[in-house]
Each structure stands twice: as structure tokens, then as C-alpha cells.
Design a protein with these regions (language model features):
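Nucleotide-activated donor-binding/catalytic signature segment of Leloir-type glycosyltransferases, i.e.
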Residues: 296-316
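Conserved acidic donor-binding segment of nucleotide-sugar-dependent glycosyltransferases
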Residues: 368-369, 373-380, 389-395, 409
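Short alpha-helical donor nucleotide-sugar binding micro-motif in glycosyltransferases
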Residues: 192, 315-316, 323-328
Length: 448
């Protein structure tokens, strides 16, 4: 990880980061929160992350010179975590009967009543934040807002999620998903109104949540999630990488990286690749990640008879993750629910053409005809055609790669961290000018 120098005009701060999802969970929110904590610490700020415990019990851990307060949690069994592969189906009656996958024992951890433990840590460790940064609109986030309001601490809220990310995996709620999604959209908007400053990864995400963002009571700005451009670079993976994962070095690879869950519409991508294979039998689809939909997708691949052309690689981290991006001929996501999509940033930084869905914020990274193609949601033929155009035209792929490397320069993680430093400084100074209690408010009114 590249550590940027601290800006001379920014004072050192005590920063509380509250996230109901944090490492070792693997998704966009946890990755961003981890990057934020690491980079702010590297610039000299004191950072404490408040997140659900991975064991269920309260504890505090030191991670790369910052602390993570693990708040007492309970298992949310209807949604799997992304720290490991899915558990094997449970079998009974001597292995003759497979128990339906009604729920998964390694689900998300939820901290339902975290406020007392937040107070406890801050009191025992003499930690009073200068600013609180909320990453998700759930229990830990709301508790940190309540704590901050009580102690007159400014609050910054970043909204990373689309409603579909939360509920489209729960098939039992599928008939109600339109109503639920609208309700959640309203909830996330009202949640953000508790902030002194709100951010979202892209302008499109802001416009989806706020009809007139400029009229909101607090500033609302687009700040990219950013990625470390010193880590994700357009190099060829070493020979050892291909051998380790038994990947072909000279065949076209269609790459998909991320959560393998229903709202990512990976089944659409598989069906599109099935069409591509009718004219390009050497194409390979490589799916990196795990999630609730993997068993269904593996079954779909088997039924289509394309198991030799589709590889499920499971969750990959570190340099292996970077090399999977580098090994791709083209990166493709059929997901219509991205607020930005860190994987699009990573792929573009590795010099890969990208294909996405023309919905929401993806178009800021995947620019149609510039560094890739945008397709209609679940349009299998259009996605297949877009993949084939890139696989069949090396010059087009090279042009898209070059253009993508220019686009990605705007999303350097250093710029993102500097922007949040400025935002923190702004809300801290603004909070100092506000009356602390009703007596100060009354006094100021009387002086007018």
C-alpha cells in the first residue's frame, strides 16, 4: 500500500470510523473502510474503527497502527459472509439426505445494541473523536451518530449501498422487493440527513437519492472510493500465477470479480458467455469470489454444458487478486446495483477493457465506446456481442485499455484521502462555530 504524505495545512485529528461491515468481510464497503483507516493512520491521524465482532464477543485489536473495536454481535444467518467459501451442505440420515440451504451459519455479524460499548471504549481509552465517519446505515452507524450528537462531534456519512444490495439475496422477499427497495431508498436518504456532511462515490448515486441535492440542509458531494494505483498496475502476471491456478496463458479470459450473489446478475453473464462460445470456443469465463448464488450458478454452468470453459475460483486476496485482474482479456459485470464498483476501478487500473450495465454510477468508470461498453440490464445478446467485439479485435482492446488508464487517474486513493481530510477539517471548524446547547442558542438570538 502506498502511503501518502500528510498535507501541511491539515491538523492531526482523532477519527472514528463506524462500519457495520469491516475486514475480514470482503465487499466494497469493508475494502473502502480498511483503505480509509490505513491511509488516515499513515498520515498521522489517530484512527479507531468500530465494527461488529467476528466472534460475537467484545474485544479490541491492533491492526496496522490503528485500533478496531469489535462490538458484541449476533449472527445474521440469512446472508453469508465473504471471508471464506460457503459451507458444505449439511447431510443427515447417513448422508442420504441433503438439508436445504435455508440459512448459512457463517452469516454477517450484527451489533444490535452497540452504544454502551462505544461509550465504554471511549471513556476507558480517553478517546473523544474530532469527527465520526459513518459507512453504513445500520446499528453501529446509528449508535455512532447518537454518541456523536451527545458529545457535539461532527458526523460525515458515506452511502455506499444500493437497496438491491441488501435484499435481492433474500428470495423469500422477492415479491416485495420493489416496495422494500423504495422504502430502503427513503430510509437511506433520511439517514444521510443526520450528517453534517454526506458523500457518495459518484454523482449518479447522489442524484438517485436526492432530487435536489443542492437544496439539502448539509453539503452532499461525490468522492470516489479510490484505489491504490501503485498496487493495481497493467503488468502481466508471472508464469507461477497461471500454474498455481491452472489458468491458460494464451486463451481469452472473460473476468468477473466480486460477490457471487443474486443481485450481481452473474447468471446473465454466464448465459452471455454461452452465446460467445458458439463462435469462440476457446473463451474462458473466470469468476473470482463467493456468495449465496454460487451453487445455483455452478448448476447453470453444468446444465449448459460449458463446465470446461467456466472456472469458479472462490475468494482471492492480496497479490493473487491483482494478478487475476491482470490475467483478464476483458472485465465484465452484469450487476445493475453498483454505486461505483471498486472492481471496475481495479480492472481499469490494470489496463483492462470493461463492460458494465448502463444503470446508475457505472458509466462514470465504464464509458461506452471509450474504455469499454455499456449494456442494457439482462440483455444477454448485447453483453455477448460486446464481449465478442473486444475478444475479436485486439486493436479495439488496446485502445480501450489506454483510455481506461487515463480515466482511472482521477480515482487515485491519495486524492480520495486528501478530499476526506478536507471534509473532516471543514465540519470540525463549522461545528466549533455552532452553539453547543440551548443556552448558547438563546444567548445568540438575544444578541441579534
Amino acid at each position: 500500500m502506498k502511503f501518502a504524505a500528510k498535507s501541511a495545512i491539515i491538523k492531526l485529528m482523532k477519527i472514528a470510523i463506524a462500519s457495520d461491515l469491516f475486514w475480514p468481510m470482503i465487499n466494497g464497503i469493508s475494502v473502502f473502510s480498511k483503505n480509509l483507516a490505513e491511509q488516515m493512520t499513515a498520515r498521522g491521524h489517530e484512527v479507531v474503527v468500530f465494527a461488529p465482532s467476528q466472534t460475537g464477543d467484545y474485544y479490541v485489536e491492533e491492526v496496522d497502527d490503528y485500533r478496531v473495536v469489535r462490538l458484541s454481535s449476533t449472527n445474521f444467518p440469512f446472508y453469508p459472509n465473504q471471508t471464506e467459501t460457503l459451507p458444505e451442505p449439511r447431510k443427515i440420515a447417513g448422508g442420504r439426505i441433503t438439508v436445504p440451504r435455508i440459512y448459512l451459519h457463517n452469516g454477517y455479524r450484527l451489533s444490535l445494541l452497540p452504544i454502551r460499548e462505544i461509550r465504554k471504549f471511549c471513556k476507558e481509552n480517553n478517546f473523544m473523536p474530532d469527527v465520526s465517519h459513518i459507512q453504513l446505515q445500520l446499528f453501529v452507524g446509528q449508535a455512532m451518530i447518537d454518541f456523536s450528537r451527545r458529545h457535539n462531534i461532527p458526523v460525515v456519512i458515506t452511502n455506499h449501498s444500493s437497496p438491491e444490495n441488501l435484499f435481492d439475496n433474500l428470495k423469500m422477499l422477492a415479491p416485495l422487493s420493489p416496495i422494500i427497495n423504495r422504502t430502503v431508498l427513503l430510509y437511506t436518504k433520511r439517514f444521510a440527513l443526520q450528517a453534517d456532511y454526506a458523500t457518495m462515490p459518484t454523482q449518479q448515486a447522489i442524484e438517485r437519492h436526492f432530487r435536489n441535492p443542492e437544496k439539502a440542509k448539509m453539503p452532499i458531494k461525490a468522492v470516489s472510493n479510490g484505489i491504490d494505483l501503485s498496487r493495481f498496475t497493467p503488468e502481466k502476471p508471472p508464469k507461477e500465477f497461471f500454474e498455481k491456478f491452472d489458468l491458460p496463458q494464451n486463451l481469452p479470459i472473460v473476468m468477473n470479480i466480486g460477490r457471487v450473489d443474486a443481485e450481481k446478475h452473474i447468471s446473465t453473464l454466464i448465459l452471455a458467455v454461452n452465446e460467445v462460445l458458439k463462435n469462440n470456443k476457446k473463451a474462458q469465463l473466470v469468476i473470482v469470489g463467493d456468495g449465496t448464488d454460487r451453487p445455483n450458478l455452478e448448476n447453470l454452468v453444468y446444465k449448459l454444458g460449458i463446465s470446461k470453459n467456466v472456472r469458479f475460483m472462490g475468494t482471492q486476496l492480496g497479490e493473487d487478486l491483482v494478478n487475476f485482474h491482470r490475467a483478464a482479456t476483458v472485465f465484465v459485470s452484469a450487476s445493475p446495483t453498483e454505486t461505483q464498483g471498486i472492481v471496475f476501478l481495479e480492472a481499469a487500473a490494470c489496463g483492462k477493457p470493461v463492460i458494465g450495465v448502463d444503470v446508475g454510477a457505472v458509466k462514470e468508470i465504464c464509458q461506452d465506446g471509450i474504455n469499454g461498453f455499456l449494456c442494457e440490464t439482462d440483455n444477454i445478446e448485447q453483453i455477448a456481442e460486446s464481449i465478442s467485439k473486444i475478444l475479436d479485435n485486439k486493436q479495439l482492446a488496446a485502445d480501450f485499455s489506454k483510455n481506461g488508464l487515463e480515466i482511472i487517474k482521477q480515482h487515485d486513493l491519495n486524492f480520495t484521502i486528501s478530499k476526506f481530510e478536507e471534509i473532516y477539517n471543514f465540519v470540525i471548524e463549522k461545528k466549533k462555530q455552532e452553539p453547543r446547547n440551548w443556552l448558547e442558542k438563546l444567548s445568540r438570538k438575544l444578541k441579534k
